[in-house]
Amino acid sequence: MTREKLSKDAITAALAELGDWSLATDGASIKRSFVFRNFSEAFAFMTRVALAAEKMDHHPDWSNVYKTVDVTLNTHDAGGVTALDIALAKKMNHYFGG
């Protein structure tokens, strides 16, 4: 998967398919908050995503407070959003919904 920065049009199209994800205020990242029933579910989600992110060699910027996980994705060496970010966002959506 490429680490080439996506165009604004490509990011907009991807966000339309990603549901609750949005462009961060910096314009170079995408973000989403995931809210779970409790801390255990939030932590299980983070563990599952961490294992997938490690395999992808692409790691989220995230934080967890009780049952909420806030995520920001970008590819630092590309200076913006890449296909890797979109792929990880899709994986996170899948883990959250399934």
From Swiss-Prot:
Organism expressing this protein natively: Mesorhizobium japonicum (strain LMG 29417 / CECT 9101 / MAFF 303099) (Mesorhizobium loti (strain MAFF 303099))
* Entry coiled-coil feature ranges: none
| Catalytic reaction equation(s) | (4aS,6R)-4a-hydroxy-L-erythro-5,6,7,8-tetrahydrobiopterin = (6R)-L-erythro-6,7-dihydrobiopterin + H2O
InterPro entries given for it? PCD_sf (IPR036428), Pterin_deHydtase (IPR001533)
Family, similarity comment: Belongs to the pterin-4-alpha-carbinolamine dehydratase family.
What is the designated name of this protein?
A: Putative pterin-4-alpha-carbinolamine dehydratase
The answer to whether UniProt assigns keyword Ribosomal protein to this entry is no
Q: Name one GO molecular function term.
A: 4-alpha-hydroxytetrahydrobiopterin dehydratase activity
- Extract the Pfam families matched here: Pterin_4a
Does the keyword field hold Lyase?
Answer: yes
Alphabetical GO biological process terms: tetrahydrobiopterin biosynthetic process
Keyword terms of this UniProt record: Lyase
Its EC number is 4.2.1.96
